[in-house]
Amino acid sequence: MLHVVSHPEAGEELEAAARWYEERQPGLGARFLDDFEKTLRRILEAPNRWHFIRDTNRKLNFDRFPCAIIYSVDNDHLYIKAVMDLRRRPFYWKDRR
């Protein structure tokens, strides 16, 4: 089983996006978080399945929202680098360790 480690800024991105969606429509923030959890489960089931996008980083898009989880795998750790809004500039997260 992989240990999930999230970059602090990725956690902030997740929380900010959930708040933003919730402000737009009550309950939408919870649906966003559900979609995040579903995406994370898919990654954990097959972490090496998804596309490389930069160096050792991989990306998997959410099903229902225009977002993606950017992550890398090292030994028994899955590092979440970003919870990226796909409408935002690409690779803003590239310097995160």
What positions do the PLM features span?
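Short Gly/Pro-enriched turn/cap motifs at secondary-structure boundaries
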Residues: 59-61
